[in-house]
Design a protein with these regions (language model features):
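Flexible, glycine/charged-enriched surface loops at secondary-structure junctions
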Residues: 46-52, 121-123, 192-205, 224-231
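Short glycine-/aliphatic-rich beta-strand segments at the starts of folded cytosolic domains
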Residues: 4-28, 89-90, 260-261
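Extended, compositionally biased intrinsically disordered regions at domain boundaries
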Residues: 1-18, 226-248, 315
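Domain-level signature for proteins that mediate thiol-based redox and metal-cofactor handling
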Residues: 244-321
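A glycine-rich phosphate-binding loop feature that marks nucleotide/adenosyl-phosphate handling sites
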Residues: 128-133, 200-209
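Small-residue-enriched alpha-helical segments and adjacent helix-cap loops
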Residues: 20-149
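Mobile "lid/hinge" segments at catalytic clefts and subdomain interfaces of large enzymes
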Residues: 130, 134, 139-197
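Generic secondary-structure signature for well-ordered alpha-helical cores
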Residues: 39-42, 46, 74-78, 116, ...
Length: 321
């Protein structure tokens, strides 16, 4: 059983170590909170690691210590779906930077308040930069916002990782309220129409012109496009690997799930298995490297008995027939 509010980090010689990563909105931390981090890391022999999402991870921890660590930090366990809004990265903006054009801290903290840990089709990351220098790496975020002299420019579909994608500009020169309103439309559109795919993958599947037209139609009040958004490939056919996939699987409808079945195939052909995978602690179903792995490899990384997992998955598949 995965300890509450922790992530499995490493399995070495059969021993599992875990990490906790408390949420720090905007990457801001008070001195007294920072002191608690140090005290806990020292007491439980943890290692402190700054993350790319402006948080502080405490890693190399034992499962039996996790509950006490959260209590001593004085925080609620950082819970949430793996496929959710994972982070809102914020630069100093006009509050702290001489080059800032807009108040990225105000906007970023409001986006954090609204969306952090909200469940999404895949993991989702935001970046808010107060000027075109884009210190929050906004053009490689699912939703990126960049301040200019004229207002806020909104970008969508960026990502880093093994298959990086630069975001597409959706709108420009918006004020604070319109930026929040447009982002809300983007998030709802993505939630409604996307499969288990990042925003950039979703845009590549339906086309940026279609995405932009639908979103801006609602934003401007001119009416949404009537035709439906194109769905997934027919599940009985051989699937095109998701971008970033490591392995091209051969699973089709009616096949039993085996050790060699690729995660991407399993969740697309048998979506009813998603709760089972999450229940076993395999929540990274939007990660290209994870979805491209055979079940046996993924189970090994998570320290799971693959035979037990296969039985549970096939039971769900059989019940659905």
């Amino acid at each position: 059983m995965l300890p509450k509010g922790a992530n499995l980090q490493k399995i070495r010689n059969g021993n599992k170590t875990y990490a906790v990563t408390p949420h720090l909105p905007g990457g801001f931390v008070k001195p007294e909170v920072l002191e608690k981090y140090a005290q806990v890391a020292r007491k439980y022999e943890g290692t402190l690691k700054l993350t790319s999402a402006q948080r502080i991870m405490i890693t190399n921890l034992k499962a039996e210590d996790i509950e006490s660590i959260w209590a001593e930090l004085g925080m609620q366990p950082a819970m949430g779906f793996a496929n959710c809004v994972r982070s809102v990265k914020v630069c100093p903006g006009i509050a702290f930077c001489k080059r800032g054009k807009q108040d990225s801290v105000k906007l970023g903290l409001e986006l954090d308040r609204r969306y952090i840990k909200k469940e999404m089709p895949s993991r989702m990351k935001f970046g808010v930069s107060g000027c075109p220098n884009s210190c929050s790496e906004s053009v490689i975020k699912d939703v990126g916002i960049i301040g200019t002299e004229a207002g806020w420019d909104v970008y969508v579909g960026g990502s880093a990782g093994s298959h990086p994608r630069l975001a597409d500009k959706l709108a420009e020169s918006l004020d604070y309220d319109d930026t929040l309103r447009l982002v809300d439309i983007v998030v709802r559109y993505y939630q409604k129409h996307a499969d288990i795919e990042r925003v950039g993958q979703f845009i590549d599947r339906i086309g940026f012109a279609r995405f932009q037209a639908d979103v801006l139609a609602e934003f401007t009040g001119t009416g949404a496009v009537e035709s439906p958004v194109t769905g997934s490939p027919v599940s009985s056919e051989k699937l095109t690997p998701m971008p970033g996939a490591l392995t091209e699987g051969t699973l089709v409808v009616g096949d039993p799930i085996t050790q060699g079945s690729v995660i991407a195939d399993i969740i697309r052909i048998y979506p009813q298995t998603i709760p089972v995978l999450r229940g076993f602690g395999m929540g990274c179903l939007g990660c290209p490297s994870a979805t491209g792995e055979p079940l046996e490899k993924a189970a090994g990384i998570h320290g799971l008995a693959v035979e037990e997992l296969i039985v549970a998955l096939n039971e769900v598949v059989l019940r659905g027939k």
